[in-house]
Amino acid sequence: MPDIKYLKKLALIGAINKIIKVSSSEFQKHTGASSKTTARKLKQLEDERLIERKIVPGGQLIKMTDKGIEVLKNEYVDYSRIFSPDLDILELEGKVLKGLGEGQYYVNIPGYRKQFEEKLHFVPFPGTLNVQLSESSSSLRNLLLETPAIRVEGFNDGERTFGGGKCYPVVVGSIEAAVVVPERTHYPSDLIEIIAPIKLRDALKLKDGDRVVVQLKKQGTENQK
């Protein structure tokens, strides 16, 4: 189990976004631990691949890995659940961009399209709105994935097998929509793909780079999680 305290301290002094140079004695001031303990904790973080570290004259170069950042994001989600247990609406903010098209692929296959109509109660427009989440909202993506979802079942059409996925009902600019998350996906952790009954880009006059707010309404129970 990683020592979150030391990982958090590294993030606070900048190692989450860039390579920083810090000596053991300097980092010791941030942790309040002995130099021996500080050195041991840094070695543990490196061994667990939560940080990348290189010893250089005058100190060491340190940068958090994607795995280390994910550990802190999960910690953030836990604290959000502790201090905001009755939060009814989760807001995610990001910018519109051209995406990977996985959600669009789902929308245009009859076996999926029928389920969307039955379970989301709308016929989806044959396309998606792709949103790259801001840094703060990216941290909340895990919280979104832990909320009750609407299950989209996988199926076989006689020629090939299609995997399942989950949908999270959302509102985008007062329009009912849903975030689509395939079971097997190549999405970056900061990207979400949204389907809706109409073309959101046209309805909301959005273009690449525009800011958009996505509101997730928590459901009472998940539909076949």
From Swiss-Prot:
FMN binds at residues 185, 193. InterPro entries: RibK_CTP-dep (IPR039063), Riboflavin_kinase_archaeal (IPR023470), Riboflavin_kinase_CTP-dep (IPR023602), Riboflavin_kinase_dom_sf (IPR023465), WH-like_DNA-bd_sf (IPR036388), WH_DNA-bd_sf (IPR036390). Mg(2+) binds at residues 128, 130. It comes from the Archaea. It catalyses: riboflavin + CTP = CDP + FMN + H(+). Its cofactor is Mg(2+). CDP binds at residues 99-104, 198-201. Keywords: Flavoprotein, FMN, Kinase, Magnesium, Metal-binding, Nucleotide-binding, Transferase. Its EC number is 2.7.1.161. It holds the Pfam family CTP-dep_RFKase. Pathway: Cofactor biosynthesis; FMN biosynthesis; FMN from riboflavin (CTP route): step 1/1. One of its GO terms (biological process) is FMN biosynthetic process. Binds 1 Mg(2+) ion per subunit. Transmembrane segments: none annotated. Residues 90-225 are annotated as: Riboflavin kinase. HAMAP family: Riboflavin_kinase (MF_01285). Catalyzes the CTP-dependent phosphorylation of riboflavin (vitamin B2) to form flavin mononucleotide (FMN). Belongs to the archaeal riboflavin kinase family. This is Riboflavin kinase. It comes from Methanosarcina barkeri (strain Fusaro / DSM 804).
